[in-house]
Amino acid sequence: MEIKGSFTVDYKIEKVWDIIADANKFAKCLPNVVSTEVNGDNFQLQFKVDAKKYTSKFLGAGYLSNLNIKFSAQLKEKQENKHVLIQGDGSTIGLKFSIALYIDISTQDSSTKIDWKADIELGKMAKLFGEDIVNQAVTDVVNQTVDNLKKMLK
């Protein structure tokens, strides 16, 4: 599954780079984080996703109201003020997934343009919940992450 987008912020490229190239700062952009452990360019975290709105149509799925997700990632391919790859693996309720998040930044007048693409391998998760539901949940998490990045820049 691939999700991509772009947005522009009214900040210098160095300020944007300072956040996306720092595992500790970038981890703070992720929504609903319960715990974070950072070691250089590596980070491990746990976060929650409120699954009620995605699983409510499944009878007996009330126990899935909050999904606890474990996620380990590494910042790779750093090209200062240009590009970073955040690659990681996660799991929830015994199901595994992997994400490769490519972030490219460029100067546009006095602003910075951020182009991003997330390649996500959902494995059995898409089969269990259905691709549409998982796509919506993943899109929501990605959009919250982008919104949190914008807030950090202010």
Model-assigned labels for residue ranges:
Residues 1-52:
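Hydrophobic ligand-binding cavity/cleft-lining segments
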Residues 1-2, 6-7, 37-39, 94-104, ...:
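Soluble, non-transmembrane catalytic domains of enzymes that act on hydrophobic metabolites at membranes
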Residues 85-136:
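Beta-strand/loop substructures that line and gate deep hydrophobic ligand-binding cavities in soluble
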Residues 137-150:
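Short, well-ordered alpha-helical segments
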